[in-house]
């Protein structure tokens, strides 16, 4: 945890009182004392610092801080991801990783090679996935929570929803081991938002690939090696970010 994240509702008259895992981290990991300063931010809001004003003694685990939010949140990420629903244990890892690396929206959809039981994992009950996104933000010192949208049927997603949003993207990429293009060729030279589609463990089936390419998605391969979904998401995000940064600097 590199930043303590709070909600607007937790701040009262410039003060916040913590009595959960965040307080435990301040006490046990940071070993902070009264008067020490820690990074703090409001989810989907400003960042700044918190000065510790009180640390509970005895059986009290409470930590109180005076909050000074003097920094604007980082700009919104310009990468969104379409993800065929993976196994729950892998989805948890991916949620944390994409929040840490920075995405705007995660579109989670069904696919031919996705087991229907994956939707019953409980992660989507009462937004149970939020804690995993939060862990990624805490790692990256960010406050902007990615949006998550779920689609339990593939065809309504790709035929009805997706055509309504594609105009908002400068580049659209579908990761496919037999794609004919390289990642660098799929990214347009002009800056803008990018939409990346990553399939399930068994990959997208031909019908799904055709649906994406009919919407002007560029099918790209990331090399000869077949990667697990969580590895592919991180590698592709990093590759896109590196290519765009190199172009931005004119190298």
Descriptions of predicted regions:
Residues 26, 91-94, 208:
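Hydrophobic side chains in well-ordered alpha-helices
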Residues 206-251:
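Structured adenosyl-cofactor binding patch, chiefly the S-adenosyl-L-methionine
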Residues 72-173:
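RNA substrate-binding interface of SAM-dependent RNA methyltransferases
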Residues 164, 169-208, 217-220:
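Active-site/ligand-binding-proximal alpha/beta "capping" segment
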Residues 42, 110-111, 176-179, 200, ...:
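Short secondary-structure boundary segments
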Residues 2-3, 37, 62-63, 79-81, ...:
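Structural motif
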Residues 1-71:
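N-terminal positively charged helical leader segments and presequences
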């Amino acid at each position: 945890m590199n930043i303590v994240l709070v909600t607007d509702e937790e701040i009262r008259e410039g003060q916040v009182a913590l009595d959960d895992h965040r307080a435990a981290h301040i006490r046990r990991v940071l070993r902070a004392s009264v008067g020490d300063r820690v990074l703090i931010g409001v989810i989907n809001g400003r960042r700044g610092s918190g000065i510790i004003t009180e640390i509970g003694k005895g059986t009290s685990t409470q930590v109180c801080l005076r909050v000074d939010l003097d920094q604007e949140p980082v700009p919104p990420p310009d990468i969104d991801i379409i993800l065929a629903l993976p196994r729950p244990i892998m989805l948890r890892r991916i949620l944390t990783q994409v929040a840490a690396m920075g995405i705007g929206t995660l579109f989670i959809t069904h696919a031919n090679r996705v087991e229907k039981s994956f939707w019953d994992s409980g992660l989507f009950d009462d937004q149970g996935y939020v804690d995993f996104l939060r862990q990624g933000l805490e790692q990256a010192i960010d406050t902007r929570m990615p949006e998550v949208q779920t689609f339990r049927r593939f065809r309504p997603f790709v035929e009805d929803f997706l055509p309504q949003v594609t105009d908002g993207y400068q580049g659209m990429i579908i990761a496919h081991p037999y794609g004919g293009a390289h990642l660098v060729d799929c990214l347009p030279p002009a800056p803008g938002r990018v939409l990346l589609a990553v399939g399930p463990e068994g990959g997208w089936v031909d019908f799904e690939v055709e649906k994406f390419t009919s919407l002007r998605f560029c099918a790209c391969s990331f090399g000869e090696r077949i990667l697990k979904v969580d590895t592919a998401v991180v590698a592709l995000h990093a590759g896109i970010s590196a290519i765009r940064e190199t172009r931005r600097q004119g190298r």
